[in-house]
C-alpha cells in the first residue's frame, strides 16, 4: 500500500481502524517500509480494505456515504465488537505555519442497526495539531459529537464556533468552503490523501508504476 497527497512534505505516521469486519482498535505505525504479519484469517486483508473504505468514505457525497454505512457485509458480527462504531484516524507530519507539525484527524460513524432505521450516521470528528517543538501540546481546531459540531475560526480564537452539518456530511469537507481559515492547507491535505492499494503478487507492474508516478 502506498500513500500519496498533494503536499509532498506530508509524512503519514500512523493509521487507526476500529469497528470494521473483525478489526478492533488496530493502529498501524508506518515507516518507509512497513509489514503486516499475522496468521491466516486474522484480518490482514480486512485491515487494508478498511483503509481503502475510509478513503472512499472521506471523498464521497453524503448520499453515497449513507449507503456505505448500511453495507452489512462490513459490519462487525463478532459478539465482542458487534456494537462498535467504525473509526478511522490518521496521524501525519507536515509543514504548518513554517513549522514541522504533527496532525491528527479522525472520524467515526454508527453502522446501521438491525431495524434499518437507527444508526447510519456520523457521530464524531476531530482535527488537532501540535508543532514539533519543546513543551508543545495538541490544539483542537475541529470537534464534533452526536449533538454538536464546532470549529475554530481564527488563530487567536477557540474551537467554539458551532456549525450545522448533516448526519452524512464531514466537517473536513464542508470547511473547505471557508478558504480564509488559517488551517485551510491542513483541510486540503486531508481531502487529498490517496492510498494506493496494490496486489503486487498478482500484478507487480502496477506496484512499480504507482511508485514511479
Tell where the protein language model's regions lie, with residue ranges.
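Phosphate-binding P-loop
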Residues: 25-31
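Hydrophobic anchor at the beta1->P-loop junction of P-loop NTPases
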Residues: 36
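The conserved Walker
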Residues: 40
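N-terminal pre-Walker A segment at the start of P-loop NTPase domains
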Residues: 2-24
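Electropositive, glycine-dotted interaction segments
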Residues: 100-213
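Conserved lysine of the Walker
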Residues: 44
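Conserved P-loop NTP-binding catalytic core
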Residues: 48-115
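A generic structural motif
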Residues: 18, 91-95, 128-132
